[in-house]
């Protein structure tokens, strides 16, 4: 999913800001000032959507029933041209084959959709006999098409299959997919060059700058896992700094357990904090709600490996 795709063009040159979980945004010297060529950004954005979708699937499975809300999930990322400016529609059709119908942007390996035969690039014609056009027309105001379709899947009764009517290479195909029920938190990708991740009570927002900074999916999983941990723990804003610091420490620890339970490498993931620390040359601007990157890294390394998976509710 993506939250802000109305901006035309997709920047790859990075002027990164340290805004991820506790560092004030500070513009870094432009190391690669050139933007991605106009005709390439949809392909790169689709790649990033797939990357986030794969990490989301694994972390939601690892969280299991620990999240306050669980929902049926089949492991797909959906996309629709309506989330983009009309002037970009011809480019989207030419580069990522997205035209009038919503499409499957990615399928998580090993997910119900993957095992049933759904593939990236499939056009979504209907869900359970209800046309995509009908679902789109009745969606609440302000809801993007991809979310409306995923919400339709999330309302599936336990044990019931979702019937996908798809078009692939001109042929209309039908797949019956039985969702799994697990953590309902979704990862939302938004276009921003800052290194940022934040959460509310339902979703985790990940910036494209964070994706560019995270060298591996292990690092990305630690960032996302930290934010999912805030949701699991029911953390809220507006508390004293000392209390908030305890929340952040707990989210670090639970986020590490989540990424381990999801099958990611803890040692590789923790390097995210190390690399953020190496860039934090103005540490005096760090929020009092967070300990130093060095202290946080040391605390994570001292934690025992995760043993109980999926993680248990607090």
Where are these regions (language model features)?
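PDZ/PDZ-like peptide-tail recognition elements
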Residues: 39-102, 176-178, 189-192
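Short helix/loop segments within enzyme catalytic domains
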Residues: 33-72, 170, 239-289
